Amino acid sequence: MKKPYPIIVMTILSFLSLNSSAQEVIRLRSCEDNSIIKQADSLKNMYANDGFVLLKEASISMESEYEMPVVVPLNQGSWYQFVFIGDYTSKLYEVRMYDWNEKQVVFQQKRWGDVDGNVISYSYIPKFSEFHMMKPVQVNKQKKKNLCGYVMLFKKAGQNTGNASITASDNKKSNL
């Protein structure tokens, strides 16, 4: 008598693979917005004057209400400054940062109309040398796609800069 288990297992796996391939994935694409570039240049000068070195920067094309995960290796005890600049027409800007254990270590939110509302900037000194994930998101009711965002990672000068790199990973819809 033949065992039905292999057939059942194969059927379940085929359904799971169909379901997972149907999910939308947003790929990292750059964008260009002159007002964001001017803001980024101004912030780069300000942080350079404060003794920070720019490790990485990237312009990213985003969709409204979708997170754009950015993964970076951070060194224990080093002082980092992370900056996210969103499209000035968006109504809400948010950044969450998680450590390797997926514990949320930073949360910042700004709304349109706040002073520097489209810029979120925060300092962070990691307790461990490990990868961290930043998840910037912006909400825009008029433009759903092709929102420009800009991320920058700075490190306090005089500290080992290592090989930090910004990497975008697959996106999941924000829980707003």
Segments predicted by a language model, with ranges:
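Bacterial Sec-dependent N-terminal signal peptides
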Residues: 1-26
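C-terminal edge strands of extracellular/lumenal beta-sandwich accessory domains
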Residues: 24-51, 127-176
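Non-catalytic, beta-strand-enriched accessory regions in extracellular/secretory proteins
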Residues: 52-75, 79-81, 175-176
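Exposed beta-strand and adjacent loop surfaces of beta-rich binding modules
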Residues: 79, 90-94, 146-148
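Residues within well-ordered beta-strands of beta-sheet-rich folds
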Residues: 79-83, 133-135
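Short, surface-exposed beta-strand/strand-loop-strand elements in extracellular ectodomains
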Residues: 89-104
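Solvent-exposed serine/threonine-rich low-complexity stretches and specific carbohydrate-binding patches
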Residues: 107-114
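Beta-sandwich interaction modules
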Residues: 116-128
